[in-house]
């Protein structure tokens, strides 16, 4: 579940698509993939939800995320516990990937739900990372965002305006940050981005979406990592910036200063249930932080470890490492690994809580 903010007008833009792939088709994002009637509905919702400066918050939603007490409920609750975020609910628009999500959204957040139809594909269930349906869902999102750019809407995942530059075309969060906001070796995270609607970004999203053909079986984030340092962004004059994890953190590299953190993303975590369990804990910890800035001993409050995500992510990566070793000792290695994991279950670090601040999508916590 990811969030974005849109700002702009509904003017249509005509622009040519360009290809750097030679014999690959010169594919172009087109609003013809969306029925005109659906576009009218989207335009009406955006107009009604927009602020005076035409700002709208958008999140994507499927059935798995919309179940009662799942991530969507936690996301809505975060507006109530974040600093100054409750009034923003009236500007929140939900792009639903399936009928069940649309029905649930209409119940809990009426008049702000848009059914983003995709004929022939069922996006209702929990799509595990890198499965075929997961890849389709991620690329469908990129296509949708490209359409929004053509409608001249800028979008951003959540709302930390003071930390964003108005002079940059494309700003995106990182799994890991090198310390240089212009370093193309920063590992990007597609869960948070601010993109200005102009011809450069329209061309870049066309190029990004088409690049899935050049890098098959990879998700949008991996493909972006491949193309961000190539010649095409420079050729079209795209201004790109990578956001500091101090303000835009995630589970991979947590934002540790609670006075500065704007958003936190649920990266480096596998499984919806793991995210939900640790999210509930994060909400409780945040509410405690807001109500009491310091603990009784004078120390700044910190966050409990997201144990469910920590253990599952460690297990996943270690399993991949062991299974990739083509040795006769594989079976023995796996057995020893399982025993080690069982022991580690009782030895996970519990004292350095700051190190493991975790959130999903972008729960509104500060600023």
Swiss-Prot record:
Top-level taxon of origin: Eukaryota
InterPro entries, alphabetized: At1g28695/At4g15970-like, Nucl-diP-sugar_transferase
A Pfam family the protein falls into: Nucleotid_trans
PANTHER family with a match to the protein in the record: EXPRESSED PROTEIN-RELATED, GLYCOSYLTRANSFERASE
Designated name of the protein: Uncharacterized protein At4g15970
Species annotation: Arabidopsis thaliana (Mouse-ear cress)
């Amino acid at each position: 579940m990811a969030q974005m903010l849109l700002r702009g007008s509904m003017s249509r833009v005509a622009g040519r698509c360009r290809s750097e792939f030679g014999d690959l088709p010169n594919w172009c994002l087109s609003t013809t993939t969306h029925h005109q009637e659906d576009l009218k509905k989207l335009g009406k919702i955006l107009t009604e939800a927009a602020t005076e400066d035409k700002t709208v918050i958008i999140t994507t939603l499927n059935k798995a995320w919309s179940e009662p007490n799942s991530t969507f409920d936690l996301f809505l609750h975060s507006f109530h516990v974040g600093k100054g975020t409750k009034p923003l609910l009236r500007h929140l628009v939900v792009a639903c990937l399936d009928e069940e999500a649309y029905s649930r959204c209409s119940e809990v957040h009426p008049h702000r739900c848009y059914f983003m139809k995709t004929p022939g594909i069922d996006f209702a269930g929990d799509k595990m990372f890198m499965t075929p349906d997961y890849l389709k869902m991620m690329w469908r999102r990129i296509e949708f965002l490209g359409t929004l750019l053509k409608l001249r809407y800028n979008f951003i995942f959540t709302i930390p305006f003071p930390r964003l530059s108005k002079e940059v075309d494309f700003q995106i969060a990182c799994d890991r940050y090198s310390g240089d906001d212009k370093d193309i070796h920063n590992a990007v995270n597609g869960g948070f981005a601010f993109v200005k609607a102009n011809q450069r970004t329209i061309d870049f999203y066309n190029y990004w979406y088409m690049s899935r053909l050049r890098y098959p079986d990879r998700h949008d984030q991996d493909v972006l990592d491949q193309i961000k340092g190539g010649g095409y962004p420079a050729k079209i004059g795209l201004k790109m910036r990578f956001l500091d994890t101090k303000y835009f953190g995630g589970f991979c590299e947590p934002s540790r200063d609670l006075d500065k953190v704007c958003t936190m993303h649920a990266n480096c975590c596998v499984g919806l249930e793991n995210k939900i369990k640790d999210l509930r804990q994060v909400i409780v910890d945040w509410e405690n932080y807001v109500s009491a800035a310091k603990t009784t001993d004078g120390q700044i409050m910190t966050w409990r470890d997201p144990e469910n995500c920590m253990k599952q992510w460690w297990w996943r990566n270690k399993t991949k490492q062991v299974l990739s070793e083509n040795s006769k000792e594989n079976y023995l290695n796996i057995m020893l690994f399982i025993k080690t994991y069982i022991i580690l279950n009782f030895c996970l670090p519990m004292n350095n809580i700051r190190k493991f601040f975790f959130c999903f999508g972008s729960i509104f916590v500060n600023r």
